[in-house]
Amino acid sequence: VSKRFEGKLAVITGAAGGMGLAFAQRFAAEGAGLILTDVDESALARAASALRAQGATCTAYRVDLALEPEILRFAAELSAQHAQLHVLINNAGLAYGEVAHAFESLTQAKWLQFLSVNAVAPLLLAQALRAPLAKARGVVLNVTSMASYVPATAYGVTKATLNAMTYGMANVFGADGIRVNAIAPGLMDTPASRANLPPETYARVQGQQLLKLEGTADDVAALGAFLASEDARFITCEIVSCDAGNRMRGWR
């Protein structure tokens, strides 16, 4: 594995498991120091301990991204400790669940909860860390979803919001030399996908893929490492699908 991130710092939200942990493992393998957050403190501690046992340098913070004061407190602490931050991966999000497809049962409280974590938190964190990212001419990666292109009431709409926000961030942050892109994963074999999709839905969506492969969190992490690296120095304001061609057919 190349060491494209030697001497660099990567901030990864939702890093206790799934795609967040895969990002952490990939960036650590390529030499990055890690700053990890999650709302699940015990799971985050286990993940950080396992990463350190593999040789990674990482610090872990419990942050509830639904709460603006916690986001700002975390960002202020990082900015005070680190003059430069090279990568911010806005990976944390609330997954599908019942309200993703049950329009009639979607309450204002539930909608605002999805919106705050999936769309507002990435904006607040990027805003608050803009100075150290600018000093490093860093990269922001937003993790959206193939669901942003299909009818998925709460989850899909908030991820579509994050797609649009990616364009807005790229437009503003480009003046600072900060690249902003998003990854839109398709169906991935992660605990969240298995827990939130009925088996028949999982099988149907997987069957729509143009490539008959099992997508994994490592596939998304590999794409993220490319987009955050100097190999992608001329790429910004893009939403890159990682879905085996599923977007072409639509997730029904």
Feature names for model-found ranges:
Residues 137, 174, 179, 235-237:
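Short, small/polar-rich loop/turn modules that mediate ligand/substrate recognition or access, typified
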Residues 126, 158-161, 166:
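Active-site helix of classical SDR
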Residues 3-35:
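Canonical Rossmann dinucleotide-binding motif of NAD(H)/NADP(H)-dependent dehydrogenases/reductases
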Residues 2, 95, 100, 236-252:
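Short C-terminal tail/terminal secondary-structure segment
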Residues 131, 171-175, 233:
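Alpha-helical segment proximal to the catalytic Tyr-Lys
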Residues 182, 203-235, 240-244:
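C-terminal helical subdomain
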Residues 99-103, 107-112, 205:
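Substrate-binding pocket helix/loop in short-chain dehydrogenase/reductase
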